[in-house]
From Swiss-Prot:
Keywords: Cell cycle, Cell division, Cytoplasm, Septation. It holds the Pfam family SepF. Cell division protein that is part of the divisome complex and is recruited early to the Z-ring. Probably stimulates Z-ring formation, perhaps through the cross-linking of FtsZ protofilaments. Its function overlaps with FtsA. The gene is sepF. This is Cell division protein SepF.
Amino acid sequence: MAFKDWMNNLRDYFVEDDEEFNEPTRPVQESRPTVASTPKPKVEERKVQADYQSRRPAQSTPKPQAQTAAPKRSASTFSKPMPEKIVQQQTVSQAQSLAATVSTIAIKEPRAYADIMESARIVKNGECVLVNFKFMGDAQARRSIDFMTGVVFTLDGDIQNVGGQIFLMTPANITVDAAKEMSILAGKNFESYDIY
């Protein structure tokens, strides 16, 4: 009960009593929004027109030489930004195509099953991941490989055992053609290489 009384006293502290303050009550007037037409659009139109006129070259000069030279100037000023835009677009598209061709491979060495989520996010973002399970126990490594196989299957990617405890996860847009290298790692075809 003491806690309840304390809470009521605390509440009463913040609640105003009408008896303590004998202020006359005034009716609350609702403020209605008034719609007033302002000449702001006209001012903005004038600014736009002024900006447009300031960008246009002066063509009202009375000299005939200036009139013949004015169209050349206006043609050169309007044609100049176009090639710059085209060049910029070409460089941007070249940079994007270069970025699309450059692939990165992340190397991860998870220590627990929870660490494998980071590798799954990387593959989901379209990058390759090389996962080394040397710091993980066999049971957790098998569970992680099952999880990674599901992730890669969902993304239409691929998972390959590169060697021992190392697996390569690739997204759908990247293929790995390493049959010869895989056979070397597996211990086959050593007779084709001369040691001496």
